[in-house]
Amino acid sequence: MNTAITATTPTEYSYNDRYINRELSILDFHLRVLEQAVDPLHPLLERMNFLLIFSRNLDEFFEIRVAGVMEQFALGNESRSPDGLTPRQVLQKISETAHAAIERQYRILNEEILPKLREEDICFLRRGELTPAQSAWVKKYFQEQVAPVLTPISLDPAHPFPRLVNKSLNFIVTLEGKDAFGRQIDLAVVPAPRSLPRVVRLPDELTGGKEHHVMLSAIIHEHVSDLFPGMTATGCYQFRVTRNADLALNEDVEDLAKALKGELSSRRFGRAVRLEVTQNCPQHIYEYLLEEFDLNEEQLYKVDGPVNLARLVSNFKRPHLRYDSHTPVVPKVFKKTESIFSAMQKQDILLHHPFESFAPVIQLLREAARDPQVLAIKQTLYRSGADSEIVQVLAEAARNGKEVTAVIELRARFDEESNIEVANVLQEAGAVVVYGIVGYKTHAKMIMVVRRENNKLVRYVHLGTGNYHAMNARIYTDYGLMTTDKDLCEDVHRIFQELTGMGKMAKLKKLLHAPFTLHAQLINFIDEEIANAKAGRKAQIIVKVNALTEVQLINKLYEASQAGVQVDLIIRYDLLFTSGITKFIGKHSGTFNCRTVSFEHTRVYYFSNNGDARIYCSSADWMDRNLFNRVEACFPIEDPALKKRIYQQGLLNYLQDNQQAWLLQGDGTWVRAQPAAGEKLHNAQRELLETFK
């Protein structure tokens, strides 16, 4: 399959030819996720799941990215980003794209997913479809399970418009009549607590054993008049407001955890950035809501269905409508030995999640917690959860008298509250808990175990590209390296010293680490490939990351391509530049081959290095925040067999994908990869599932 894209020269394009707006690039990624919902290669319930993922993704996009641009616009910022757009222009483009995408999302739901589910006897019944017996059951359910937890709020001078929680389901009700106090009430708001399920399954005896469900919104809509005795509800309309959820935290505070706790509550009531209403909501009602939330019609989204598809989930009992479950395999090296420590002493061990099990990582900690020869355990935690097995094992180790040090990043977005709880659990167990470096998020993924062996201290290290989160390790692809390499272990030790103590930058032997050496060394590696290409030697760079937005590296990749280096990019969601193919195709010997796939999380950097390839795995994407504002670890893969595995399975395999990959075009748009004439179908992730059976 020929997907090469010829690069451009720096003198032949303006900045907006070279760069893609970051917000629009992220939105493009979400649109590619939405396209999975119409892909016939996916089973039906997996397609439905992609619709829900799209909703969750879009929620966060508005909460963080759109909210940030709105703040720039509100402050009168008219400066242009590298792509040439002002904040106002970005907001307009987002609105146009998002409105069209959401309309398409609900059309897919109503015209494709729900009808096909009905063919499988999975139904979401509308109010008019209920039988008398089902209606009676729903009424009883409302009276016993729903009404007691609802709080209807009339809107009058004594009851101003309530502060509604971010992304909560609410109903605005139009009324006729007078209440118990003789007041004429025209409007009321009914918030639906998050504790209520959004989908209610009817009993089997009322459905003939079929999976019939009723939306909570339909139940409330049908019986909303019961909440206003003596009055008549003439209309009931769902709505949902999305708010700015980014946290503004002063880095100079004395107690980061305490300050963060104080800020978390504000996230629920930040400035409104989007209003969703149902299509049947009258104009005078949504205009009233827009005024209350200080929004305009550009920020209004009318939807043909429930206003929150992200919670449209249920435990459907249809295995044939889902992918077969995959049981992650345990590498053979662990099956040949009783101890993780003895396995790691024999060789470096590469784990490729979710195809290979995350269990060896947990087992390393468990053995360390219970081994009398283990003296200390040190670990970074970014997203884990207080109830995770890793946190529980670390707490056990501390209670067993081990010196446990946890470097917890409290500011991991949307996991702040959970991470505070993790810190409390570990502190109560006796662990030393630190929050990293003020002004820098700790994003490196590192474990170090110190063990006494033959009167010497031996270190065991795990380095990863993804979080220490067992559930995520079953969903996202990541690499982990388990090693006793003395230089790597010493480097990890020095980074932990940086994180917990004070002193100058640690000089490392093998690891590259941000914010100190990583960016500069990446530039050096690219320069070496440029020199090789100019000398007539084969030169190739492959970058597999979630995001590539750092301008210096982007410019250096352009330079490399112009020099004749083959540049292959595998980017999950955020890409800041375009290849320029539409204007400058065929003018240079170098090529760009840029593609994207969903649910990939590995960060791998490959430099051909004149036949002696360099392969690094890392916690860092190629973004300003990772390279300059975070503590990151980038580790070399040196074992020839492991290098071959990563190159073939983690890089070349994805470059050959012609089913799930999307290819970047010269105008910044993406097209779905298609097999060339006579070319075999190739799905990279499916190939790995087959490999690791």
Swiss-Prot record:
GO cellular component, one term: polyphosphate kinase complex
Post-translational events: An intermediate of this reaction is the autophosphorylated ppk in which a phosphate is covalently linked to a histidine residue through a N-P bond.
Keyword annotations from UniProtKB, A to Z: ATP-binding, Kinase, Magnesium, Metal-binding, Nucleotide-binding, Phosphoprotein, Transferase
SUPFAM superfamilies for this protein: Phospholipase D/nuclease, PHP14-like, PPK N-terminal domain-like
Reaction equations catalysed: [phosphate](n) + ATP = [phosphate](n+1) + ADP
Active site per the UniProt annotation: 443
GO biological process: polyphosphate biosynthetic process
Gene3D superfamilies (alphabetical): Endonuclease Chain A, Polyphosphate kinase middle domain, Polyphosphate kinase N-terminal domain
Molecular function, one GO term: metal ion binding
Presence of keyword NAD: no
Cofactor: Mg(2+)
Top-level enzyme category: transferase
Residue sites binding Mg(2+) per the record: 383, 413
Record-listed E.C. numbers: 2.7.4.1
Amino-acid positions noted as binding ATP in the UniProt annotation, renumbered to this chain: 57, 476, 572, 601
Record's function text: Catalyzes the reversible transfer of the terminal phosphate of ATP to form a long-chain polyphosphate (polyP).
Family: Belongs to the polyphosphate kinase 1 (PPK1) family.
Full protein name: Polyphosphate kinase
Natural source organism: Acinetobacter baumannii (strain ATCC 17978 / DSM 105126 / CIP 53.77 / LMG 1025 / NCDC KC755 / 5377)
